């Protein structure tokens, strides 16, 4: 009978634990803990894909009528998310060249909720001026989201340089094969 009461407490969200494999399970929890440790973060959330991680991060911060400032050097799927998908939710994006710090500053609006970019843009390999971008975001009181798929925490840890949220597609370099 103890198991019944334990399950009841879990489903009523009265205590933490694994309820349903699609929500959480011990294996995914280990993955999340390891990615958080590699990044030097406090927590991580595993999703089905890197694109879903980006979408979830943006949708957590934004509502209809909001705006994001985005580096123009991004993976094509991410560009399409900001150009085609997010506008369907009423979220607008302004694209700025990764080294154009004045452009980032000018692009921030009253309804801007974050700055998003890749430290090293894929496919152009243009380096984002992260110290300046973080400074601009901090002055505006908005978070910086960095897609660090290309670097992995072995090469660069965005959180140590002022990023607030880091996303990855683990099927690229983090998984060790880089074949996706």
Regions found by a protein language model. Name each.
Residues 1-5:
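Short, small-residue-biased leader/transition segments that mark boundaries at the very start
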Residues 44-180:
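Conserved PLP-enzyme active-site core in the AAT-like
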Residues 7-55, 77-85:
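Conserved N-terminal alpha-helix of the aminotransferase class I/II PLP-enzyme fold
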């Amino acid at each position: 009978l103890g198991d019944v009461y334990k399950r009841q407490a879990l489903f009523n969200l009265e205590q933490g634990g694994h309820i349903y494999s699609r929500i959480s399970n011990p294996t995914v929890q280990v993955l999340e803990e390891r990615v958080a440790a590699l990044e030097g973060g406090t927590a991580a959330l595993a999703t089905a894909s890197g694109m879903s991680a980006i979408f979830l991060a943006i949708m957590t911060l934004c509502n209809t009528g909001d705006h994001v400032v985005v580096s123009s050097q991004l993976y094509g799927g991410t560009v399409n998310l900001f150009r085609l998908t997010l506008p369907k939710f009423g979220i607008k994006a302004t694209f700025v060249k990764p080294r154009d710090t004045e452009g980032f500053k000018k692009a921030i609006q009253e309804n801007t909720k974050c700055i998003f970019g890749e430290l090293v843009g894929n496919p152009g390999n243009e380096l984002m001026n992260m110290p300046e971008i973080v400074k601009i975001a901090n002055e505006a009181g908005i978070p910086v989201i960095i897609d660090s798929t290309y670097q992995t925490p072995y090469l660069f840890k965005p959180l140590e340089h002022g990023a607030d949220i880091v996303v990855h597609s683990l099927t690229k370099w983090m998984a060790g094969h880089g074949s996706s």
